[in-house]
Amino acid sequence: MHLVKDAGYAVEIEAEENIIPYIETYVNDGKLIVRYKDDVNINNRRDVTVTVALPELEEAGITGSGDITGETKFTGNDEIELEITGSGSMRLNVDAPAIEAKITGSGDMYLSGNTRDIKCSSTGSGKIDAGELKSENAVVKTMGSGNIHVFASVTVNATINGSGDITYKGGGAVSSKIHGSGSVKAVD
């Protein structure tokens, strides 16, 4: 899925002609849902590409094994919530007062841009790389073997339960709690 900042809303799907009838798009509780219909087993020869145009990003999520790529920078006035459940991958450039990034599973998330406060959590083996997302304050928690990298110029509050590692840059003051073999380290 490709996200593009635009004045209006639009969804475009590129797929093999015989697969398009089995793809559902609908809005549920203010969220755009794109998925295959229930009880359908798809065997496609090429990837399905979904391009979504929207004026502002409030949240984005993957359940399963999809990819989300922001083709433009997204600016928000409130918190932006980003979540991967499964093995998906997300790459976004965001600018908002607060960002929440969460992975459950083995997904990968790459974030850049600017924020005041970021909260990151990884449960499982997922990786969050927010080293290019300039933040003042970071609250970071890894449970399992997932690794998280952040930039924080004021504070880093790190919690590890397991073997995951937390790395940080930006010079923020660090407080950490470690239960397991993981580590908290400053990097350049």
Task: Tell where the protein language model's regions lie, with residue ranges.
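Start-of-domain marker
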Residues: M1-E12
